[in-house]
Design a protein with these regions (language model features):
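Transmembrane alpha-helices and adjacent helix-loop boundaries
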Residues: 1-6
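Loop-to-helix entry region at the N-terminal start of transmembrane alpha-helices
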Residues: 8-38, 123, 127
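Membrane-embedded alpha-helices of multi-pass transport/permease systems
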Residues: 25-29, 33-55, 85-86, 93-97, ...
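Short helix-to-coil transition segments within interhelical loops
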Residues: 47-77, 117
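Transmembrane alpha-helices
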Residues: 65-96
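Glycine-rich helix-loop "coupling/hinge" segments at transmembrane-helix boundaries
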Residues: 94-130, 150
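C-terminal transmembrane helix and the adjacent membrane-cytosol boundary/short C-terminal tail
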Residues: 125-152
Length: 152
């Protein structure tokens, strides 16, 4: 579902849960609903990429399920999990910019209200540049952290 449609679709639920459907607080429910399935799918992919032989050897050595999760699955998938967090954060930046279009506040609201509606190209350029910088910083930090967990 395109996020802008999800935003509008979830207005009644947001109103019910939070008591308001606009502003930064009103954007929390749609952002959460959009981010959770994305993140869980990415983590699922990371966990599925673990070599089954590693898991099999942990089971053969008699490790309990909680121990396998803690000592095998999470460490083996940590690189992918951190990359998943990074990608989810980048998508949340994009989603939050779209939330500004429907009154969610933030940089998207600034771009629409002062850039688009007032035909202020300078403001539009600045908001686009700020979003690009924010995404690049997020990507750089995520890559820097995930490098520490990369398996050769």
């Amino acid at each position: 579902i395109p996020f802008i449609i999800l935003l509008v679709f979830l207005i009644p639920l947001t109103l019910l849960l939070i008591g308001k459907s606009t502003g930064p607080t009103g954007a929390i429910v749609p952002l959460t609903v959009a981010a959770i399935p994305l993140f869980t799918r990415l983590v699922d992919t990371s966990l599925n990429e673990i070599d089954y032989g590693v898991i099999e050897s942990a089971v053969a050595s008699g490790a309990s399920l909680p121990l396998i999760v803690k000592e095998v699955l999470i460490p083996e998938a940590m690189f992918g999990i951190i990359q998943s967090i990074t990608l989810t954060l980048i998508n949340l930046i994009a989603f939050s910019a779209m939330a500004g279009v429907v009154g969610g506040g933030g940089i998207g609201d600034l771009a629409i209200r002062y850039g688009y509606y007032r035909f202020d190209n300078f403001t539009m350029w600045i908001t686009v540049i700020l979003l690009i910088i924010l995404v690049q910083i997020t990507q750089y930090i995520g890559n820097s952290i995930s490098k520490q967990f990369k398996k050769n």
